[in-house]
Amino acid sequence: METFLFTSESVNEGHPDKLCDQVSDAILDACLEQDPESKVACETCTKTSMVMVFGEITTKATVDYEKIVRDTCRGIGFTSADVGLDADHCKVLVNIEQQSPDIAQGVHGHLTKKPEEIGAGDQGHMFGYATDETPELMPLTHVLATKLGAKLTEVRKNKTCPWLRPDGKTQVTVEYRNDNGAMIPLRVHTILISTQHDETVTNDQIAQDLKEHVIKPVVPAEYLDENTIFHLNPSGRFVIGGPHGDAGLTGRKIIIDTYGGWGAHGGGAFSGKDPTKVDRSGAYIVRQAAKSVVASGLARRCIVQVSYAIGVAEPLSVFVDTYKTGTIPGKDVLTLIKENFDFRPGMMSINLDLLRGGNFRYQKTAAYGHFGRDDPDFTWETVKVLNPQA
């Protein structure tokens, strides 16, 4: 039996790039909560003792950017310089301007356009992917890496492992078999966890706690065997972390945000962008389309691409591939997708309820993946049952 190895990584919410994603989306939440028509393109960067937010925002909302930055950093656990950043004493820089009027008139017609007429906020192409290898219809490598990162944060915040600090990375290698285009996970080959820790803990304690409190509750026992390799803090020391260890920037973890290297990616990041930015809304609707194809039993694996031109409402192209796993011809799958999903930006915002912010709606997406999450706010995970015409 021919097998292959595939690897996906994740980082948890204390990683500097992910801190930036969460700040950008916390600002988006604040804008949309007060003004659902807000136009937001918010970037964040961070380094030792400093967080800067910058970009273009046009909104009627009253937003205290500095408070949002400090609250978000504090919520992650950055409460002292020792752990990588002090939320209450770091410098916060803000350089926010309004959206270019050239873009505004081309996309929104200065808000005179009906929802179905609203053009894409930029050109670009986005991909959605789904696979039947997990209940989430997501790749197992990505699911495990992401859940290990989330569990690291959980046992840090609930004090199960009080030696943990906010920054951390995970990586999972799975051995697969290709079953005529469908992916069959056989076993977990390697688990890698690198987590920030305090000065007092020993490497033996780190390894013991990670196996017992992080890996054991997350990775199903049937995937582990005597040959599974564990690299637990292989560098030996990870005390300095967060923005003190590395600079961070919004939009630098786009593979972690999506499918862990499976499928494809058009290159556009998600966080800090309102739904007129098709980098985000387009990627959400093609995930819903691909997931619906697999959940409806039309294929075991599916990828969907959509593309846009700035200022144009209708997509330029829609593509689907079922990797030879389809139960009906590919052209029929494409027809069903076009009949059941409206790819115009204004309609995606309505159909997926994307103009609703606040209550951490978008901030939640900015750590532990945008897809495969069991949360009613992740409206794009709702399956539409697709019935082929007899």
Curated annotation (Swiss-Prot):
Residue positions annotated to bind Mg(2+) are 9
Cofactor-binding details, from the entry: Binds 2 divalent ions per subunit. The metal ions interact primarily with the substrate. Can utilize magnesium, manganese or cobalt (in vitro). Binds 1 potassium ion per subunit. The potassium ion interacts primarily with the substrate.
* Protein name as it appears in the record: S-adenosylmethionine synthase 2
Gene3D superfamilies (alphabetical): 3.30.300.10
Record localization: Cytoplasm
Gene, per the UniProt record: SAM2
Binding-site list for K(+): 43
Give the matching PANTHER family: S-ADENOSYLMETHIONINE SYNTHETASE
The GO terms this record gives for MF are: ATP binding; metal ion binding; methionine adenosyltransferase activity
Q: Which organism is it from?
A: Petunia hybrida
Does Cytoplasm show up as a keyword for this record?
yes
**Entry's PROSITE patterns?**
ADOMET_SYNTHASE_1, ADOMET_SYNTHASE_2
- Report the CDD domains cross-referenced here: S-AdoMet_synt
> Which Gene Ontology BP annotations are present?
one-carbon metabolic process; S-adenosylmethionine biosynthetic process
Q: What residues does ATP bind to?
A: 15, 167-169, 235-238, 246, 252-253, 269, 273, 277
Q: Which Pfam families does the entry link to?
A: S-AdoMet_synt_C, S-AdoMet_synt_M, S-AdoMet_synt_N
Q: Which UniProt keywords apply?
A: ATP-binding, Cobalt, Cytoplasm, Magnesium, Metal-binding, Nucleotide-binding, One-carbon metabolism, Potassium, Transferase
